[in-house]
Swiss-Prot record:
Tissue specificity comment: Expressed by the skin glands.
Record keywords, A-Z: Amphibian defense peptide, Antibiotic, Antimicrobial, Disulfide bond, Secreted
Ranges that cross the membrane: none
Function in brief: Antimicrobial peptide.
Top-rank lineage group of the source organism: Eukaryota
Protein name: Brevinin-1AVb
Family of this protein: Belongs to the frog skin active peptide (FSAP) family. Brevinin subfamily.
Localization per Swiss-Prot or TrEMBL: Secreted
Main location: secreted
């Protein structure tokens, strides 16, 4: 589990970068 990776994924999926 990589929190940073998850955060980036959420960022891209929700388009809130």
């Amino acid at each position: 589990f990589v929190p940073l990776l998850v955060s980036k994924l959420v960022c891209v999926v929700t388009k809130k970068c």
